[in-house]
Curated annotation (Swiss-Prot):
GO terms for molecular function: RNA binding. Keywords: RNA-binding. It comes from the Bacteria. Pfam families: CRS1_YhbY (PF01985). It comes from Haemophilus influenzae (strain ATCC 51907 / DSM 11121 / KW20 / Rd). This is RNA-binding protein HI_1333. Residues 2-98 form the CRM domain. InterPro entries: RNA-binding_CRM, RNA-binding_domain, RNA-binding_YhbY, YhbY-like_sf.
Length: 99
């Protein structure tokens, strides 16, 4: 799991601002297929948005915690139903500022 400093999180939030959600969770919740899609998107993009729809606060937080745990990605930000995740790939596309 990647730990990010406040400076790095602010940098990633700025990059993520213009992104659209790549993965959207529906009524079925967090399935193996959704996790595989998130993994694929993280490998390809490093920084993604995931939309967690139609859940109450506690359920949404449990889903977010499960996604972060399973993907070993860093949770950059959560606003409403949108989760921003970051995980560096082998060939880093995003150069983070120093801690």
């Amino acid at each position: 799991m990647t730990t990010l400093s406040t400076k790095q999180k602010q940098f990633l939030k700025g990059l993520a601002h213009h992104l659209n959600p790549v993965v959207m969770l529906g009524g079925n919740g967090l399935t193996e297929g959704v996790l595989a899609e998130i993994e694929n998107a993280l490998n390809h993009h490093e920084l993604i948005k995931v939309k967690v729809a139609g859940a109450d606060r506690e359920t949404k937080q449990l889903i977010i915690n499960a996604i972060v745990r399973e993907t070993k990605a860093a949770q950059v930000q959560t606003i409403g139903h949108i989760l921003v995740l970051y995980r560096p790939s082998e060939e880093a596309k995003i150069q983070l500022p120093r801690k």
